[in-house]
């Protein structure tokens, strides 16, 4: 989650959700009576309805929320309500409209009575779920930064100080510089618990850094991308590119793989500290025992309305006890395994004997 602005006087928070997890998180904080402003498409009829033409017109609307629906299958949040602000020439004010919010779509959320600090903290916690590290480097400068939902923080920067192209020591100095930059980047990635590292720059130095990084860090995706320069300017250029959003979404898949691997490890060695199937995980959530929860997106759209309601209550229970909640697509290899385990799995804070429901 990228948090762009918090205005407590106006009761406004401006955010950009970046993953399905972020979309679900928004569904838990947006409530009836809130005001939500976002870009949208509205079908406008010209001439007499039925005989005239109609077009879907892009516009920015503010709605007073009446209903919020999280659609995990489409990774969208549907926000339905009465339009209270919009272009006058289209006559949309006072009519119903549904905003469709997906990853990458900026929105303003206004709570007329003010944002409770607990909800702001909830958004901030969510914005720290996934971290990426960017190293932007060329033959002159480098910078290393951590990228989270709250923004970009430069943690290291400097010059390569290479001798001239005709200097016989240039290649050795370049190798030394690459080693230092790669080690610095690896240290940042480990310290920030990053799931991916992007090596960016205009030339070949970024490739050398990426190659060195692959030998220094494990379990971290290394991505290489082209930007026009190294240093801090290169970092911010990289962050503005859409590839970062896709990388963060890919990182969420890596996180799901990590949870499944830990689940399988505990299944063999600590079976009391896992739960699977909706019933088991729900019971664990009631006890406050869920540490991390991984749920299949299609589980939220079960054909049985009672099951859907049970899933919704499970998510709210888990959230209330500060469990980390993750979603995974049924079309992914991880999703295929989670489906075979009942559509939802959990890592537990302590062991539970589900036969007798006693802690251990």
From Swiss-Prot:
Q: Which GO terms describe its biological process?
A: nonfunctional rRNA decay; nuclear-transcribed mRNA catabolic process, no-go decay; nuclear-transcribed mRNA catabolic process, non-stop decay; ribosome disassembly; RNA surveillance
- Location of the protein in the cell: Cytoplasm
InterPro entries the record matches: eFR1_2_sf, eRF1_1_Pelota, eRF1_3, Pelota/DOM34_N, Pelota_arc, Ribosomal_eL30-like_sf, Transl-rel_pelota
Q: Would I find Metal-binding among this entry's keywords?
A: yes
- Chief location of this protein? cytoplasm
Q: Which GO terms describe its cellular component?
A: cytoplasm
MF terms (GO), sorted A to Z: endonuclease activity; metal ion binding
- The enzyme's main class, written as a single word, is hydrolase
Keywords on this record? Cytoplasm, Endonuclease, Hydrolase, Metal-binding, Nuclease
Q: What's the domain remark here?
A: The N-terminal domain has the RNA-binding Sm fold. It harbors the endoribonuclease activity.
Which NCBIfam families would you find in this protein's record? pelota
Membership in a protein family: Belongs to the eukaryotic release factor 1 family. Pelota subfamily.
Self-association state and partner proteins as the record states: Monomer.
What task does this protein carry out?
May function in recognizing stalled ribosomes, interact with stem-loop structures in stalled mRNA molecules, and effect endonucleolytic cleavage of the mRNA. May play a role in the release non-functional ribosomes and degradation of damaged mRNAs. Has endoribonuclease activity.
Write down what this protein is called: Protein pelota homolog
Q: What is the organism field in this record?
A: Hyperthermus butylicus (strain DSM 5456 / JCM 9403 / PLM1-5)
């Amino acid at each position: 989650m990228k948090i762009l602005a918090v205005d407590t006087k106006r009761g406004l928070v401006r955010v950009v959700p970046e993953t399905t997890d972020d979309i679900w998180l928004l569904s838990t904080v947006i409530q009836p009576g809130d005001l939500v402003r976002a870009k949208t498409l509205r079908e406008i009829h010209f001439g007499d309805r039925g005989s005239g033409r109609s077009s879907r017109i892009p516009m920015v609307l503010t709605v007073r929320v009446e209903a919020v629906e999280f659609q995990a299958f489409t990774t969208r949040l549907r926000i339905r309500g009465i339009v209270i602000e919009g272009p006058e020439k289209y006559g949309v004010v006072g009519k119903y409209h549904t905003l469709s919010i997906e990853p990458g779509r900026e929105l303003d959320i206004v709570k007329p009575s003010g944002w409770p600090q607990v909800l702001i903290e909830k958004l901030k916690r969510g914005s720290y779920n996934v971290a990426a590290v960017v190293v932007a480097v060329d033959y002159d400068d480098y910078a290393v930064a951590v990228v989270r939902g709250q923004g970009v923080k430069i943690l290291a920067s400097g010059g390569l100080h290479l001798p001239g192209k005709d200097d016989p020591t240039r290649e050795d100095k370049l190798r030394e510089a690459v080693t230092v930059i790669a080690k610095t980047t690896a240290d940042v990635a480990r310290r920030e618990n990053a799931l991916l590292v992007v090596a960016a720059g205009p030339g070949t130095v970024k490739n050398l850094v990426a190659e060195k990084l692959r030998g220094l860090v494990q379990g971290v995706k290394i991505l290489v991308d082209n930007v026009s320069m190294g240093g801090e300017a290169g970092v911010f250029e990289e962050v503005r590119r859409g590839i970062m959003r896709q990388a963060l979404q890919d990182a969420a898949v890596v996180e799901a793989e990590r949870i499944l691997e830990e689940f399988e490890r505990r299944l063999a060695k600590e079976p009391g500290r896992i739960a699977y199937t909706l019933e088991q995980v729900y019971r664990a959530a009631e006890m406050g025992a869920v540490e991390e929860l991984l749920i299949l997106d299609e589980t939220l759209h079960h054909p049985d309305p009672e099951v859907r309601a049970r899933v919704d209550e499970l998510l709210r229970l888990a959230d209330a006890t500060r469990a980390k909640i993750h979603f995974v697509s049924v079309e992914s290899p991880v999703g295929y395994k989670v489906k075979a385990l009942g559509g939802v799995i959990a890592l537990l804070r302590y062991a539970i004997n589900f036969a007798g429901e006693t802690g251990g």
